[in-house]
Amino acid sequence: MPGPVDATPPPELATAARTLFGDRLDLAVAYAGLLVTDGVIRGLIGPREAPRLWDRHLLNCAAATERIPLGATVVDVGSGAGLPGLVLAVARPDLSVVLVEPLARRTAFLVEAVEQLELGASVRVVRGRAEEVAVGGAGVEPLTGDVVTARAVAPLDRLARWCLPLVVPGGRMVALKGASAAGEAAEHAAVVQRLGGGAPEVHQCGVGVVEPPTTVIEIRRERVVATPRPASAKRSRGGRRG
């Protein structure tokens, strides 16, 4: 049988990991262990990503907590393997997190991870697409959050269509992005405003802690725009990521 997997952060990232996770670093290590074992086996994390899990994924996601208010309810759209939703829940025990994911194999992993990490009091998993859970139907309950997060899911215009209806008025959407953030914010600002959002703002998170800093696009929901019920919500749950 293979020996235990060492999922601790590499020495050069130990200070950043301790800064971002504090006394819950052991819990973050336990989650990392699930990702580099079951996550890889189930195809949720690529084998090449495992060695760079801490710098490219865990610390990158944890840095975004600085944009999330104390005690917020967070809805994470397209959670996949739990990035960023589970990371946020690990780093911030004050948050209430809902992981939204349409694919069965991913939701199965998330449910098991929440159980193994003993996060059931603050985290729950909902199988469905963002368009469905925003309006409910087909066995999917309507959801809203103070903050709605997404990472590596889609271009900003589509993300806004999916995420803004889930944000409570006055709340915010926080999309973790890369080098394209400023360009996307400018390109899709008009679409965002038609959907009830304010001007997209680009923020750098974790400056001085992680390198490179985590880039996020933040959009405040300024007004409510009617959300049409998706055809899939009238039939059955499923389909591709949404």
Curated annotation (Swiss-Prot):
Annotated SUPFAM superfamilies: S-adenosyl-L-methionine-dependent methyltransferases
Coarse class of the protein's main subcellular location: cytoplasm
Assigned keywords, A-Z: Cytoplasm, Methyltransferase, rRNA processing, S-adenosyl-L-methionine, Transferase
InterPro entries with a match to the protein in the record: rRNA_ssu_MeTfrase_G, SAM-dependent_MTases_sf
Binding site for S-adenosyl-L-methionine: 78, 83, 130-131, 151
Gene Ontology cellular component list: cytosol
Molecular function (Gene Ontology), one example: rRNA (guanine-N7-)-methyltransferase activity
Subcellular location: Cytoplasm
rRNA processing found in the keyword field: yes
Pfam family, one: GidB
Keyword Aminoacyl-tRNA synthetase in record: no
EC number: 2.1.1.-
Transmembrane segments: none
Similarity-based family: Belongs to the methyltransferase superfamily. RNA methyltransferase RsmG family.
NCBIfam families, alphabetized: rsmG_gidB
Function: Specifically methylates the N7 position of guanine in position 518 of 16S rRNA.
Protein name: Ribosomal RNA small subunit methyltransferase G
Taxonomic source organism: Salinispora arenicola (strain CNS-205)
Lineage: Bacteria, Bacillati, Actinomycetota, Actinomycetes, Micromonosporales
